[in-house]
Curated annotation (Swiss-Prot):
Belongs to the cytochrome b family. PetB subfamily. Heme b 1 binds at residues 100, 202. This is Cytochrome b6. Heme b 2 binds at residues 86, 187. GO terms for molecular function: electron transporter, transferring electrons within cytochrome b6/f complex of photosystem II activity; metal ion binding; oxidoreductase activity. InterPro entries: Cyt_b/b6_N, Cyt_B6_PetB, Cytb/b6-like_sf, Cytochrome_b_N_euk/bac, Di-haem_cyt_TM. Heme 1 (or BH or b566) is high-potential and absorbs at about 566 nm, and heme 2 (or BL or b562) is low-potential and absorbs at about 562 nm. It comes from Piper cenocladum. It is found in: Plastid, Chloroplast thylakoid membrane. GO terms for biological process: photosynthesis; respiratory electron transport chain. Its cofactor is heme b; heme c. Pfam families: Cytochrome_B.
Amino acid sequence: MSKVYDWFEERLEIQAIADDITSKYVPPHVNIFYCLGGITLTCFLVQVATGFAMTFYYRPTVTEAFASVQYIMTEANFGWLIRSVHRWSASMMVLMMILHVFRVYLTGGFKKPRELTWVTGVILAVLTASFGVTGYSLPWDQIGYWAVKIVTGVPEAIPVIGSPLVELLRGSTSVGQSTLTRFYSLHTFVLPLLTAVFMLMHFSMIRKQGISGPL
């Protein structure tokens, strides 16, 4: 086993990478509230795992979506647990994200030279809210349907571009199959990809600049 490790160590310098990760300086003022961002990341990873598991059974059509969710909850092995964990971790992710934003703001973590870290964090907060909006509609029950209808109808108040924007969100002039397909694609592919990219940027900047000092 040691020969295998030595072979990889010689080529990749694994020990040097591990030392760099574990030897990062942590300021003495850091407390449990500085862990909120990491907890948010953990919730996101749980979301990815449980969401991926549900894609094996969920059917993104207006005629089968609700029935497929019922199947997950009542027939699929541990489906009820997987969906419940998905919902609980979604709520936890939103809560931890809000608390994290407040902590950073109140401790001045957005100030120079960490402005870009703050910007990427705000973008991640918007993406988190978008997860909630798109995921809420996927069961395609009465609550989900009317939530989509209201949310996609909001931009109509914008002059000139309002109506085209509503049609772009819905995929047609009314809420239907095209809308569900769009929201499913956003929820399972576009938003996770964007979130992963901005999280990588966010954590890379934190690693580079370190944790902000006390007020």
